[in-house]
């Protein structure tokens, strides 16, 4: 007895990838999940004020804030996995907006860091060479010449005597103000002053 088999018509998938599959591979899904996990970790690592500016839905914001609060290693790991799970519920547009905002934040940080390094190099040049002040004043004619000379002289003196770097830090602030850099980087100035402690 022969059996008749019924042939079903093949329906073509709406979208087919390069390999002929109609859905993403497991490897592709894993890569995407890992990317979202990394993005979530980047959000958790952001400074508090930068985190407030991120375009996040409330559920993700709550999960990220909770991950920042947890200090236990295993608890934090689990919470970060939860952040990744919440991120998988976001639309592509929401994820793209988050990536754009994070890239912009990283760009701002790089520019600010480069600016602080320039100020530190300028300070070192001013302390090492008297001609550097003339060049600095040529580039920044609105700078207070007398204050600059006084700070340089006092910073050199305190370095020779091994005193705390008060004028060293004030010179940093003077350069920042004279060159038109906005304030608010006192911590960086303090760190730069601490470097001086090690050298002295």
From Swiss-Prot:
Q: Which InterPro entries match?
A: DarP, DarP_sf
Major subcellular location class: cytoplasm
Gene3D superfamilies per UniProt: PSPTO4464-like domains (1.10.60.30)
Q: Where is the composition biased (Basic and acidic residues)?
A: 12-25
Return the Acidic residues bias intervals. Answer: 184-200
Keyword list, A-Z: Cytoplasm, Ribosome biogenesis, RNA-binding, rRNA-binding
Q: GO:BP terms for this protein?
A: assembly of large subunit precursor of preribosome
Which domain of life does the protein's organism represent?
A: Bacteria
Q: List the residue ranges of the region (Disordered).
A: 1-25, 177-200
The record's subcellular location field reads: Cytoplasm
On whether Nuclease is a keyword of this UniProt record, the answer is: no
What cellular-component terms does GO give this entry? cytosol
Q: Which GO terms describe its molecular function?
A: ribosome binding; rRNA binding
Give the family from UniProt.
Answer: Belongs to the DarP family.
Question: What does this chain do?
Answer: Member of a network of 50S ribosomal subunit biogenesis factors which assembles along the 30S-50S interface, preventing incorrect 23S rRNA structures from forming. Promotes peptidyl transferase center (PTC) maturation.
Protein name, per record: Dual-action ribosomal maturation protein DarP
Q: Gene name, please? A: darP
């Amino acid at each position: 007895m022969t059996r008749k088999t019924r042939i079903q018509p093949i329906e073509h998938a709406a979208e087919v990838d390069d390999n002929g599959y109609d859905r993403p591979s497991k490897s592709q899904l894993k890569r995407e999940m890992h990317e979202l996990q990394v993005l979530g970790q980047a959000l958790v690592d952001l400074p508090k004020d930068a985190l407030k500016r991120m375009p996040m839905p409330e559920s993700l914001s709550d999960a990220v804030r909770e991950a920042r609060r947890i200090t236990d290693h295993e608890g934090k790991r689990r919470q970060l996995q939860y952040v990744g799970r919440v991120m998988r519920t976001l639309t592509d547009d929401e994820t793209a907006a988050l990536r754009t905002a994070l890239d912009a934040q990283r760009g701002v940080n790089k520019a600010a860091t480069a600016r602080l390094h320039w100020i530190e190099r300028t300070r070192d040049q001013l302390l090492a060479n008297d001609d550097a002040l003339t060049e600095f004043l040529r580039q920044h004619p609105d700078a207070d010449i007398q204050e600059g000379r006084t700070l340089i002289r006092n910073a050199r003196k305190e370095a020779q005597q091994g005193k705390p770097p008060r004028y060293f830090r004030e010179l940093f602030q003077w350069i920042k103000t004279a060159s038109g850099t906005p304030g608010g980087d006192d911590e960086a100035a303090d760190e730069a002053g601490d470097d001086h402690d090690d050298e002295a």
